[in-house]
């Protein structure tokens, strides 16, 4: 039997760390198809912190792609599970036959599916990638992303799967300890990445609430982002008074980030695609409602779980936010499919499907 190989095709430290730790701590002990990884980027201590995994690291996305293609050609029974997919060479290999459809299973992370960049090289590449995506053996994704993908590629198998957000189920009831009143605190974006469209989001928040709310913008990730942080701060201070605007430019440890989220009353996410599911989960767990772009298909996942959804086009005020908080507080968090531990069984199923052991 050939063991499934997992591929992290881009050097995205935060996401790669989450995936590797999840496999090491949760999946590797019970499945031999959860132990082999090929990773773009440096080790950064992963080998030491994930002893249950066999990890091979590659200095560039191209080097990793070449290694994957060589393995795929050497053994056509070898299957790969691609987590996210921001590696141009791998899509081209699928398109050209270097990797066969039956070898290619893909967990969609959101940004790898949507065509949002206006850069010339991306606009030229998107049509090729779209064709290649129709040739994968199967995809795993959120309900909204599955719906989006199926409209383009109805013949490709799709299974529900959620990114393994680090969550403590014991905190599901913790939000009820806090009394919510007074000035609203609004979280804008889930990171410092430009995809959050921070400036447009700040303007939208100001249009809805004026300079009457506290605005928190976490921008400590990714690194080397100071110029953009300064740009966002300048735009924010043109709208909000200094005491109402908090731009966080330092990377935060998980517990500190969790504590920050729990001080908020509302999350505001203007991007028109599925992303930031980890932050959304942690907010929902704390009974903090989220404002989404109507083009972000994750609202379908939230509605399926009977969670209140607010949209950027809604008329928002404190009364609307407090009512959404009340509705969230009435939801039994233990039954939400994209919460831990409920997302575990779909991962076991995904491993068996990608490995060819399940129909």
Swiss-Prot record:
| Disulfide-bond pairs as recorded | none
Q: In which compartments does the protein localize?
A: Cell inner membrane
Q: Which family does it belong to?
A: Belongs to the glycosyltransferase 56 family.
Which pathway does the database say it acts in? Bacterial outer membrane biogenesis; enterobacterial common antigen biosynthesis
A GO molecular-function term, please? 4-acetamido-4,6-dideoxy-D-galactose transferase activity
The EC designation for this entry is 2.4.1.325
Sorted alphabetically, the keyword list is: Cell inner membrane, Cell membrane, Glycosyltransferase, Membrane, Transferase
List, alphabetically, the InterPro entries matched.
WecF
Main subcellular location of this protein, as a coarse class:
membrane
Q: What does this protein do?
A: Catalyzes the synthesis of Und-PP-GlcNAc-ManNAcA-Fuc4NAc (Lipid III), the third lipid-linked intermediate involved in ECA synthesis.
Its BP terms in the Gene Ontology are: enterobacterial common antigen biosynthetic process; fucosylation
List the membrane topology term(s): Peripheral membrane protein
Q: Which reaction does it catalyse?
A: beta-D-ManNAcA-(1->4)-alpha-D-GlcNAc-di-trans,octa-cis-undecaprenyl diphosphate + dTDP-4-acetamido-4,6-dideoxy-alpha-D-galactose = alpha-D-FucNAc4-(1->4)-beta-D-ManNAcA-(1->4)-D-GlcNAc-undecaprenyl diphosphate + dTDP + H(+)
Q: Which Pfam families match?
A: Glyco_transf_56 (PF07429)
According to its record, what are the GO cellular component terms? plasma membrane
Name of protein: TDP-N-acetylfucosamine:lipid II N-acetylfucosaminyltransferase
